[in-house]
Design a protein with these regions (language model features):
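Short helix-initiation/N-cap motifs at beta->coil->alpha
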Residues: 53, 76-87, 184, 207-219
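N-terminal secretory signal peptides
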Residues: 1-11, 16-29
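Bacterial lipoprotein signal-peptidase II cleavage site
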Residues: 28-41
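Contiguous mixed-secondary-structure segments that line small-molecule binding/active-site clefts
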Residues: 102-194, 198, 202-212, 227, ...
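Metal- and O2-centered redox machinery and metal/ROS homeostasis
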Residues: 42-45, 64, 71-72, 94-96, ...
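Short helices/loops that flank or line small-molecule/ion binding pockets
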Residues: 60, 64-68, 83-94, 110-111, ...
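Short, well-ordered beta-strand elements
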Residues: 41-54, 72-76, 176-182
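Extracytoplasmic small-molecule ligand-binding "clamshell" domains
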Residues: 56-58, 73-88, 93-100
């Protein structure tokens, strides 16, 4: 499965390097919407994912873990948004996919910003209850992985230090001097820009540039075409000391921990599925996920290879 696709949420960038590399479509059999089965005679499972690097990696790791246990795996990775994924679950196109607790809370449950739980435990509790109690298509959100992938407001470390910007309060006070590189979904989602401005009312950027490719947002920072950008805390790019995530001291966002959402009917037929999925998620943490994302986005390694190497080293699958 080749990593050669422009990814809406997590395009890659070599900071200080040659910029964005060329991109073509992912191989259909490996990562597209209609990936074929693995050819096993075991129980069937269809694994989906959304359309960015971390999601595709998580989906690929789930797929490889199931294949290692003898399942006949169909990959339907890179499908679309959380709404697309939720519909795919409900109509039986997929059996499971990785979601984020906070994303489900905001986008699937439709909860407003003022109701966001302040703890991951409460976020997960409410989301898991919602999925379990669905009348037509009961599902389970399983135990989350032990890391969060939240929004990250990012600046060049040099710029932030020169302007004494460490927190979003600091940023808001000086925002009229700064250009913000955002993306359409963040500007429109209830947990996005309006939520940030509500909690930090002095926020008033000199200019907001809408850039829907994450890699180009990082490129804009590197080339001083923007002063502030919106990223995600497990982006591979953030391993660079040249970048600084500005602290959110008011905890304005829900908790975004990845966890599999699985059809109850699939779990009923395959009681070992929970253990398989949990073995993948518990092999991860924020540093490991950031490293894996970076291997795909920055080093241009294949999804399959990155997933396999990690799972073998973690003892999740046999080498």
């Amino acid at each position: 499965m080749k990593n050669k696709m422009m990814l809406n949420r997590r395009d890659f960038l070599r900071l200080g390097g040659a910029g964005l590399a060329g991109a073509t479509l992912l191989g259909v059999a490996g990562c597209g919407g209609g990936g074929g089965g693995s050819g096993s005679s075991g129980p069937k499972v269809s694994v989906g994912s959304k359309k960015f690097t971390e999601q595709i990696l998580l989906g690929e790791m789930y797929a490889q873990a199931f294949a290692d246990k003898g399942y006949d795996v169909t990959r339907k990775l890179n499908l679309g948004s959380e709404q697309v994924m939720d519909k795919a679950l409900q109509d039986g196109t997929i059996d499971l996919y990785p979601e984020y607790t906070g994303t489900a809370y905001v986008a699937i449950l439709g909860k407003p910003p003022e109701s966001y739980p302040k703890t991951e435990k409460e976020t997960y509790k409410q989301v898991a209850k919602f999925y379990k109690n669905r009348k037509d298509t009961p599902m389970q959100m399983l135990k989350p992985a032990p890391f969060e992938n939240n929004y990250g407001i990012v600046m060049l470390t040099k710029t932030a230090n020169e302007m004494n910007i460490d927190t979003l309060n600091d940023l808001a006070a000086k925002s009229d001097q700064l250009v913000f590189s955002s993306y359409s979904e963040f500007q429109n989602r209830s947990d996005g820009y309006d939520n940030m401005k509500e909690h930090y009312p002095k926020l008033d950027f000199k200019e907001i540039k809408i850039v829907n490719d994450l890699g180009i947002r990082y490129k804009a920072l590197a080339e001083n075409e923007a002063d502030v950008g919106i990223g995600f805390t497990t982006d591979g790019q953030l391993a660079s000391p040249k970048l600084k995530v500005i602290k959110d001291t008011k905890v304005i966002w829900p908790k975004y921990y990845p966890a599999p959402v699985v059809l109850q009917s699939f779990l009923d037929k395959n009681p070992d599925a929970k253990k398989i999925l949990n073995s993948v998620d518990q092999s991860l943490n924020a540093d490991v996920m950031r490293k894996l994302n970076g291997q795909v986005d920055l080093e241009q390694r294949d999804y399959e290879d990155v997933a396999r190497d990690h799972l073998e080293q973690a003892g999740v699958i046999n080498g």
